[in-house]
Design a protein with these regions (language model features):
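Short, conserved catalytic/metal-binding motifs centered on acidic residues
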Residues: 57, 99-113, 142, 218-224, ...
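Domain-level cores of phosphate- or acyl-group-handling catalytic modules
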Residues: 177-256
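Short helix/loop capping segments that flank catalytic or ligand/cofactor-binding pockets
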Residues: 112-114, 152-153, 228, 251-253, ...
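Electropositive, glycine- and tryptophan-enriched low-complexity nucleic-acid-binding patches
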Residues: 68-73, 127-213, 298-314, 318
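Electropositive nucleic-acid engagement tracts
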Residues: 22-37, 45-122, 205, 209, ...
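Active-site-proximal, Lys/Arg-enriched surface segment
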Residues: 43, 73-174, 284, 289
Length: 466
């Protein structure tokens, strides 16, 4: 854990720019001096400590910033939280002259304690790793990919309707008992938005805020491969919509229905080379413009498998004017949203967020973590690479460098203080307090080893056994 006495220099510039941009949207009202100081230090603290924890922020600042005041600002200060994300996006787009790109949609789970009660939108989800269940927050992300940078644009918390969940469980139980549908309770109306509606809402919000931005394509995984999602995006903007469909979905060839898997078994694939994750990869692919039953109109359906794979995956596109190779190339960009999510979990503090209760607590914590992502594009080393049309540095390597910079600045302040020895002893005590030694159950100090032996009276009783 590195010390942090002052707000990082590039963060100060970034937060000041946020305030200036806010004045353009907020009738001349930007952030107050106190809000600028608070936001700058908190963003710096998240980068240095990789957590959103007010007690840790107090320790690494040598108690310059008290945890009670930090959390008080977080909970009660009237910051324009939603507008902060908007103006931050405007800053990044303007800084690098970004006018077009591809939108990616994906969701991720943030696991929580099974005893959680007051965290917003925490619910039971299936654990993909174990096959069991856990309690988690599910977050839908909208991410923009451009020819220079990849940035998060927005998020939404998904929460299933509790009444509908109860009805579904009861309905399944009655089905097993072979109770007729007419005698089972009717399905209640859902009062919560589903994931598709949340995804469409995120795209709609971005388009309304940036109407001049050219969206080349919207890409999402097979969960969004359906008519409702496609129609929702089409109602917002005219763009290519790329997704996947399941192998058992029905398509029509010469008016006859059959599964998409059975259809493409009839045709040998064509070898192609595509660029995926920055590397050339050999693939087998074959595309057809055919009518999909679930969509009710023609789609460009492409069967694709990578070298070494046995089964095809089936990619769909709504704009039939694109070439198959271009559709596949756009679809491979989906891995970038996964990279963003891994960076966000590993370096943006939210994955180690101290419990913040309620909707506001979760939303504000997540906004802070995404502002950290945006702020990194204003670090002088990162911006120099992007301006030179070179690949930007990884989030991990950049944050490691920033931590060293913060450490050197702190050492410099200690050396030039009025009483360097006293200042050193104080900060060392605070930093060592972050890593307190905890008792390990692995080392069983009070274990009585003498109990692990046979007893004389039992040995005599069972002498002739075995």
């Amino acid at each position: 854990m590195f010390p942090l006495f002052n707000t990082l220099y590039f963060i100060s510039i970034y937060v000041q720019s946020l305030s200036e941009q806010l004045k353009l949207l907020n009738e001349g009202r930007g952030l107050s001096k106190t809000q600028i100081c608070w936001l700058g230090f908190v963003l710096s603290g998240i980068i240095v400590s990789n957590t959103i924890c007010w007690a840790i922020f107090e320790r690494i600042s040598n108690k310059k910033h008290k945890s009670a005041k930090l959390i008080g600002m977080f909970r009660r200060a009237k910051l324009p939280w939603d507008k902060l994300m908007l103006v931050s996006i405007k800053l990044v787009l303007a800084r690098y002259g970004l006018t077009e790109g591809v939108l990616l949609l994906d969701d991720s789970d943030k696991n929580r304690s099974k005893n959680v009660r007051k965290i917003h939108a925490a619910h039971k989800v299936k654990d993909k790793a174990t096959g069991g269940y856990s309690i988690a927050q599910n977050i839908m992300f909208l991410v923009l990919v451009t020819d220079k940078v990849t940035i998060p644009l927005g998020f939404a918390f998904y929460e299933p309707d509790p009444e509908w969940v109860k009805w579904r469980a009861k309905d399944k139980q009655l089905k097993k008992q072979k109770v007729p549908k007419s005698e089972r309770p009717k399905e209640p109306k859902k009062n919560h938005k589903n994931k598709r509606e949340l995804a469409v809402g995120l795209v709609k919000e971005f388009v309304s805020n940036f109407p001049a931005f050219k969206i080349r394509s919207v890409c999402a995984d097979c969960f969004f491969g359906n008519k409702k999602f496609a129609d929702g995006i089409k109602a917002i903007c005219k763009t290519q919509i790329i997704s996947q469909i399941r192998s058992n979905q029905i398509v029509y060839i010469r008016g006859k229905p059959l599964s998409v898997n059975d259809l493409f078994k009839r045709y040998p694939g064509i070898p192609e080379t595509i660029n995926c994750r920055g590397e050339d990869k050999n693939v087998i692919m074959y595309g057809m413009r055919i009518k999909g039953k679930a969509y009710g109109h023609k789609l460009f359906v492409i069967a694709l498998k990578y070298e070494g794979e046995e089964d095809y995956r089936f990619i769909t596109a709504t704009d039939l004017s694109w070439r198959a190779i271009d559709i596949v190339s756009a679809y491979t960009l989906r891995w970038l949203v996964e990279v963003f999510i891994q960076d966000w979990k590993g370096h943006m503090g939210f994955d180690r967020l101290a419990i913040q209760q309620g909707d506001d607590g979760s939303r504000r914590g997540l906004i802070l973590s995404l502002l950290v992502d945006h702020s990194l594009f204003f670090h002088e080393d990162q911006s120099a690479l992007i301006d030179a049309k070179l690949q930007a540095g990884t989030v991990g390597s950049l944050t490691n460098r920033i931590k060293v910079e913060a450490f050197l600045d702190s050492v410099k302040e200690l050396i030039y203080s009025d009483n360097p020895k006293e200042a050193y002893e104080k900060i060392s005590k605070d930093l060592m307090g972050i890593y307190e030694l905890r008792s390990s159950k692995k080392h069983m100090v009070n274990l009585d080893m003498s109990q692990y032996e046979g007893k004389p009276h039992l040995a005599a009783q069972f002498r002739n056994v075995a």
